[in-house]
Amino acid sequence: MSAAILGQVWTRKLLPIPWRLCVPGRCVSSNFKAADLQVQVTREPQKKPAPSQPLLFGKTFTDHMLMVEWNSKTGWGPPRIQPFQNLTLHPACSGLHYSLQLFEGLKAYKGRDKQVRLFRPWLNMDRMLRSARRLCLPDFDKQELLECIRQLIEVDKDWVPDGNGTSLYVRPVLIGNEPSLGVGMVTQALLFVILCPVGSYFPGDSMTPVSLLADPSFVRAWIGGVGDCKLGGNYGPTVAVQQEAQKKGCEQVLWLYGPDHQLTEVGTMNIFVYWTHEDGELELATPPLDGIILPGVVRQSLLDLARTWGEFRVAERKVTMKELKRALEEGRVREVFGSGTACQVCPVHQILYEGKQLHIPTMENGPELILRFQKELKAIQYGTSAHDWMLRV
C-alpha cells in the first residue's frame, strides 16, 4: 500500500487529541517521519518457535525493534529499526524513578490468506498520544508512528504466528529519559516498540471463566487521576492486590469505586454486564468513560458491534454492586465478562464480595453473547470477514 493511500486512510481514522494540561509550547517537539526510517537488519536471527511450541505471553521477542530518541533542543531524531537489544539508561532516568512512562498494546493477525493485519491501531495511537500529553512527554505524529510500526512488523513478518488464536503482540513504549533526580518536564525521551508472538488466551479454544475478588478497600483509579491513561504507574500497584485475590481463591480483582461500590474494571480488563434491567429491557451495560475507566479498544469494538446488531439496549453507565446483587437474586443476570487485548472476551462465574460468594450464571447461559462476540471478532481479525477496522501490513 502506498504512503499516499495510507495517509488518506489514517487521516480519516485518527482523531484530534485535546489535553488541558499541555498547552502549546509546553512539550517541545518535532515530528519524526517514516520516510526517514533507518533499517539495520540483524546478522544473528533467532530461532523462531516451532508451530507446536506454546507461545507464552511476553516471553518470546522478535529479531528487531523500533527506536526513536527525542530531546528538547532538537526534537525527534530519525526513527530506526535495529536488532532487538537491551537499553542503556542513566541511573537517574526519570522513567525509572518517577514513572514518567507509558505504553500501548495492540495485535497483528495473520489470516488464512497469509496477509498480516493490525486490529484498529488508530485507537491505540489516539490513546498513546493522550497518555503522553498527560505526562507532558513529547508529542508525536500518530500517522508517522503507525507507519513505522507497520514497517517494523513487515521486517519481522515471518514471526507472526498463524495458528488458531495466535497473533503478534505489539508493545510501543514512551519513557522520560531525563538524567536527573528532579521531578519535572523531561528534556530527553525515548520511544521504542517491541514485538512478541503470543498464543491463544484460552488454549484449545476452551473457555475458562474467572472468579473475582471485589474488595472496596482497594482502589485502582479515581476522579481527577490517570485511570484513563495507559501508564506503567497504574499497573505496578495492582500486583499486591492480585496476590491478595489469589490467596482468597480468586483469579482476578473486580475494582470498585466510591461509597456505592461502582464496578469499574476487572484486573486489567473493562467489564460488561449482560442482563435484564430492572425496567424489563434486555441490556448490555459497561461503566462510562468518566476518567476512571481505560478506553479499551476491545471495549469500544464490543459496543460498536452490539449497537450495529440493534437487538438489545447498549448502555455506558454506572453499575453498582447493590444493583448487581439484586439482579442476581431476581435471576436477571445472563453474563458478566471482561474485555481486553490479551483475552478479547473473558467470562466471569463468581464474585467474592463482603465475605460471600456470588454465583454468576455466565456459563449456564451459553455464554451466548460472549461466544457471538468472539466469533465476530475472530472473523474480522483473521480476515475472513472484510472490515475497515483492520490495517493491512
Swiss-Prot record:
Segment annotated as transit peptide: 1-27
Cofactors named for this entry: pyridoxal 5'-phosphate
Pfam family, one: Aminotran_4
UniProt-annotated location(s): Mitochondrion
Binding-site positions, substrate: 169
Biological role: Catalyzes the first reaction in the catabolism of the essential branched chain amino acids leucine, isoleucine, and valine. May also function as a transporter of branched chain alpha-keto acids.
Protein name: Branched-chain-amino-acid aminotransferase, mitochondrial
Organism this protein belongs to: Rattus norvegicus
